[in-house]
Amino acid sequence: MYLQPKKVRWRKQRRGTLKGKAFRGNKLAFGEYGIQALDRAWITQQQIEAVRVALVRSLKKGAKVWIRIFPDKPYTKKPNEVRMGGGKGDPEGFVAVVKPGRILFEFTGVPEEVAQEAFTIAASKLPIPVRLVKYGEFTFKY
């Protein structure tokens, strides 16, 4: 099941800019390990779900996973082979706006080798470079 808002105030939003670094959500809050973004991007609801499934499958039982981002920005798309103009396209889905330094996922309850393997699998599902951070480690190397 994909994450998305229950209600949106506006069906269509402007794209906005992706400037600066993440000053909120850049520290570990729940788990022992975290996946931190090193670049800026829109992460779609499908990508978030793919990473969640990959983490849950690779971490096995006894582990807990937290999703620290939420896709709350609607994005639009025009149909294929449609001429330019004619207004903005229809809403296609939702994205989470991610800036460098943002913690995307957290997990706990596994040894470091298992965490590293799970991170490698999860990182391949994301469109941006990410790094694994541990609790107590300096997290501002982005």
UniProtKB/Swiss-Prot annotation:
Top-level taxon of origin: Bacteria
GO CC entries: cytosolic large ribosomal subunit
GO term, biological process aspect, one: translation
Keywords, ordered alphabetically: Ribonucleoprotein, Ribosomal protein, RNA-binding, rRNA-binding, tRNA-binding
InterPro entries, per database record: Ribosomal_uL16, Ribosomal_uL16_bact-type, Ribosomal_uL16_CS, Ribosomal_uL16_dom, Ribosomal_uL16_sf
Pfam families: Ribosomal_L16
GO MF, any single term: rRNA binding
Entry keyword Chloroplast: no
Complex and partners: Part of the 50S ribosomal subunit.
Function: Binds 23S rRNA and is also seen to make contacts with the A and possibly P site tRNAs.
HAMAP family: Ribosomal_uL16 (MF_01342)
PANTHER family attached to this UniProt entry: 50S/60S RIBOSOMAL PROTEIN L16, LARGE RIBOSOMAL SUBUNIT PROTEIN UL16M
Similarity field: Belongs to the universal ribosomal protein uL16 family.
Stated name of the protein: Large ribosomal subunit protein uL16
Organism: Aquifex aeolicus (strain VF5)
